Amino acid sequence: MHSWPEPEVPQLPGEAPQLRLYDTADDVVKPVEIPAGEVGMYVCGITPYDSTHLGHAATYLTFDLIHRYLRAAGHGVHYVQNITDVDDPLFERAERDGVDWQDLGTSQIDLFRSDMEDLAVIPPRDYIGAMESIDEVIEMVAKLLEVGAAYQLEGDEYPDIYADYTFLPQFGYESRYDEQQMAEFFAERGGDPERPGKRHPMDALLWRAHREGEPKWDSPFGPGRPGWHIECSAIAVNRLGAPFAIQGGGSDLRFPHHEFSATHAEAAHGVDRMAHHYVHTGMIGLDGTKMSKSLGNLVFVSRLTAAGHEPAAIRLGVYAGHYRQDRDWTNDVLAHAEHRLASWRAALATGSTTLDEARELVATVRGHLANDLDTAAALEALDDWAADTKTGAAGDEAAASEIKTAIDALLGVRL
């Protein structure tokens, strides 16, 4: 599947501190693993039944920061993202709206691509739909059955295949939740703890046997379709190997999705960890209320841009808070971001900055971003520069160019 056009990202001179990110599994901020070749990064993509809201955007803008920082530091990045284009929520939305589920998925994927292009997000090298990865999933399910990490229901009308969550002793290391919390999230987030015939209530679906009216693919274990978690396991490991550097997504994916994606890959490939870093972004609320489809209070990127709000301001509004924190989107957040953008542009156009001052500023911004993406501190450093810049004096064009290049290369904001 094709992604979207890559934005022009300028080369940024100068040295960069090593990037350090919080790892959910180890509960610590630690250096990102930089292999001799490329940094492998996998970020879970959308289920295409609704257009890109700010919760989605905040996640992909966070990992765009990581992508940009690593590239500006001279590292290659192999970025992979999936699209869950076969899943129950997609079918349910299509049935509700009286449309074909594939047509709905295609339309929402197209809108997502458009939003990502507008926001100047660097596209993944591999942008893979679940339907494109069926053979990979079948291969991994077969491997899990072979090693004893999975089983097929016997004597059931629908002989689904499940992963035995007790197979690996490290299960639970990624999320660090206790058994009770895992059981609650499993039930709330797409699990089926009461399914008859399972060995354990928390065993996760790997292959769903065909039901009337659902799409199906042939497999050695009967016609059906993939479970949710194993799609990401197969797509990630088949392109990045295991372990790879960064597994990312929203904090709501911490469990069960990322825990099971990891355990499937680890059991199939005989490794202790699927990823060195598990990085999760906070949730975005609207005016103090959690943003959700059920509440009808989603803020869509496409509607903001259609109303005339500049994508660069949307980026700055998202970056005003720390990526790991749950935070609010309000009209004031957007207005402040637009004011910030205008003040930076004014400082570049009319202010005076020496080359040494510019390089010190860029180093400061890089240092804040290297410290677990401390965007608030990075933006404040730029605010201080803009406020302190004397207007009306003859500026150093090289200094202005260096600041402008850094803001574009690191933050994706074109001044």
From Swiss-Prot:
Zn(2+) binds at C44, C232, H257. InterPro entries: Cys-tRNA/MSH_ligase (IPR024909), Mycothiol_ligase_MshC (IPR017812), Rossmann-like_a/b/a_fold (IPR014729), tRNA-synt_1_cat_dom (IPR032678). SUPFAM superfamilies: Nucleotidylyl transferase. A motif ('ERGGDP' region) lies at residues 188-193. Keywords: ATP-binding, Ligase, Metal-binding, Nucleotide-binding, Zinc. Its cofactor is Zn(2+). A motif ('KMSKS' region) lies at residues 290-294. L-cysteinyl-5'-AMP binds at C44, G45, I46, T47, T59, N82, I83, T84, W228, G250, S251, D252, I284. It comes from the Bacteria. The keyword Plastid does not apply. Its EC number is 6.3.1.13. GO terms for molecular function: ATP binding; cysteine-glucosaminylinositol ligase activity; cysteine-tRNA ligase activity; zinc ion binding. One of its GO terms (biological process) is mycothiol biosynthetic process. The keyword Electron transport does not apply. Binds 1 zinc ion per subunit. It catalyses: 1D-myo-inositol 2-amino-2-deoxy-alpha-D-glucopyranoside + L-cysteine + ATP = 1D-myo-inositol 2-(L-cysteinylamino)-2-deoxy-alpha-D-glucopyranoside + AMP + diphosphate + H(+). A motif ('HIGH' region) lies at residues 46-56. GO terms for cellular component: cytosol. Pfam families: tRNA-synt_1e. Belongs to the class-I aminoacyl-tRNA synthetase family. MshC subfamily. HAMAP family: MshC. Catalyzes the ATP-dependent condensation of GlcN-Ins and L-cysteine to form L-Cys-GlcN-Ins. Monomer. This is L-cysteine:1D-myo-inositol 2-amino-2-deoxy-alpha-D-glucopyranoside ligase 2.
